[in-house]
Amino acid sequence: MSKATGFIKEFRDFAVKGNAIDLAVGVIIGAAFGKIVDSLVKDVVMPLVNFILGGSVDFSNKFLVLSMPDGYTGPMTYADLTKAGANVLAWGNFITIIINFVLLAFVIFWMVKAIYSARRKEEAAPEAPAAPPEDVTVLREIRDLLKDKQGS
């Protein structure tokens, strides 16, 4: 067998193993779940923060202009400034990403905790003792009969 076919066989064995497939599924689900958390922050959490604070608190549009291009007279929005080449510190977007991360970590923590709790319950459930094999049962019956005969 050549080195190339050996490498291909080794790669196939690795790719078909459960761990590699589980990892791939986890990455795909994690990416989709990240989008859900991002939507949760943008569409649920931030509107609630705005409502509680009684104003429009949109962290994603908060930034600090560090330097402007010479002669710039356009709009002072983050998108326009960065497009024009301004040096902009987007601290609001960073805060939004931190909120996303904290929520994602919190939800994953609770999911892992629930999974471990379910596993512990499965492990803690005592298994019913297995019935003894038939030959052992017959030998016990013979023993009991012999004890009864000796006792009488």
Swiss-Prot record:
Described function: Channel that opens in response to stretch forces in the membrane lipid bilayer. May participate in the regulation of osmotic pressure changes within the cell.
Q: For this UniProt entry, which segments traverse the membrane?
A: 21-41, 44-64, 92-112
Enumerate the GO terms in the molecular function aspect.
mechanosensitive monoatomic ion channel activity
For this protein, the record's InterPro entries field holds:
MS_channel, MSC/AndL, MscL_channel
State the source organism's domain of life. Bacteria
Q: What is this protein called?
A: Large-conductance mechanosensitive channel
Q: What is the gene name?
A: mscL
Q: Which UniProt keywords apply?
A: Cell inner membrane, Cell membrane, Ion channel, Ion transport, Membrane, Transmembrane, Transmembrane helix, Transport
Q: Which GO terms describe its cellular component?
A: plasma membrane
SUPFAM superfamilies reported for this sequence:
Gated mechanosensitive channel (SSF81330)
Source taxonomy: Bacteria, Pseudomonadati, Pseudomonadota, Betaproteobacteria, Burkholderiales
Q: Where in the cell is it found?
A: Cell inner membrane
Q: Which family does it belong to?
A: Belongs to the MscL family.
Q: How does it assemble?
A: Homopentamer.
Gene3D superfamilies assigned to the protein according to its UniProt record, in alphabetical order: Large-conductance mechanosensitive channel, MscL, domain 1
Q: How does it sit in the membrane?
A: Multi-pass membrane protein
Q: What is its main location?
A: membrane
